[in-house]
Amino acid sequence: MAFQPTPLRVALVAGEPSGDLLGASLLGGLHAQLPASSRYYGIGGPRMTAVDFDAHWPMEKLAVRGYVEALKHIPEILRIRGELKRQLLAEPPDAFIGIDAPDFNFGLEQALRGAGIPTVHFVCPSIWAWRGGRIKKIVKAVDHMLCLFPFEPELLEKAGVAATFVGHPLADEIPLEPDMHGARIALGLPDSGPVIAVLPGSRRSEIELIGPTFFDAMALMQQREPGVRFVVPAATPALRELLQPLVDAHPLLSVTLTEGRAQVAMTAADAILVKSGTVTLEAALLKKPMVISYKVPWLTGQIMRRQGYLPYVGLPNILAGRFVVPELLQHFATPEALADATLTQLRDDANRRTLTGIFTDMHLALRQNTAQRAAEAVARVIDSRKPH
């Protein structure tokens, strides 16, 4: 890149843990691609701040899920967005990168783009799955979209939005053949015997809704498969405290409750019961049979159902274009149904071999050196705006 008389300034906003992961990966690529004097600032989490990012607000202020649940947080979120917009318009960065969080970022990006600031959005919203009307917002707000999945650029380019498929950083990070033995040693689990990882979500509201159902399902599974062990990773210390009463309420369960280490827990497992989200892709990259589930409040569920297009919600099924693992959602997510489906995934060796092949192909398709590709695309956007 040509010499810069003043340091480049790149503003970024990530709104939840998955965005923090993507942001940290992208920052690693930007540090290698852009001049060493470049500054990176905005809103991010601990992973981003660990790689020379100046967080003006903590990411947790934006990490609110669902329509109804977000209502009480709207005033503070709008205040933060207004303050950030004023800052960025007063001192324009060389580029703005919104990382996921479309409900927060698109309005901000539209205002910045209108002022001539280049806008990049990292993670295409699921316009192919639901809320397809957001393509109109993307056209107004985004100069360039960085896409995690290979089918997305074509959809965007048809609407006139420049886009680059960059792959997924998890596919770069996770080995093609995960080390189950090492993961079990790390967790103090025996090398033999069935292990099921149970992941009821990374937010308090998710765990409160589905956690009791998951633990009731675990109790049923242990009755039917007496040698089974469970490992439940809690994303934060606060969530561990929330999960501990569920463990205490099932004293006969053979369960290991860990803090963090979700990937280690899934690597150690023979099968996974998981709440829908990015973690389902992680489970697929680890080549694990799984059952995907979620429960949301009734009104949120009704809104989502009316705006949905695809018959599935789990990323492994979306990427495969068909059901390759079962999904049990809302009122279908009973302890009995979850236990039956998870034990089937645990015991069916032929299905395990089939899934290993499907998930290996998926892994190879998404392994694209995401940090470098994304950073190169950002550098091109910045370079295209400089006077030549």
UniProtKB/Swiss-Prot annotation:
Keywords on record: Glycosyltransferase, Lipid A biosynthesis, Lipid biosynthesis, Lipid metabolism, Transferase
Described function: Condensation of UDP-2,3-diacylglucosamine and 2,3-diacylglucosamine-1-phosphate to form lipid A disaccharide, a precursor of lipid A, a phosphorylated glycolipid that anchors the lipopolysaccharide to the outer membrane of the cell.
InterPro entries: Glyco_trans_19 (IPR003835)
Superkingdom classification of source: Bacteria
GO cellular component annotations of the record: membrane
Similarity comment: family membership: Belongs to the LpxB family.
Keyword Glycosyltransferase found: yes
Catalysed transformations (reactions): a lipid X + a UDP-2-N,3-O-bis[(3R)-3-hydroxyacyl]-alpha-D-glucosamine = a lipid A disaccharide + UDP + H(+)
Functional pathway: Bacterial outer membrane biogenesis; LPS lipid A biosynthesis
GO molecular-function terms, A-Z: lipid-A-disaccharide synthase activity; phospholipid binding
Known EC number: 2.4.1.182
GO biological process, one term: lipid A biosynthetic process
Pfam families reported in the protein's UniProt record: LpxB
Protein name according to UniProt: Lipid-A-disaccharide synthase
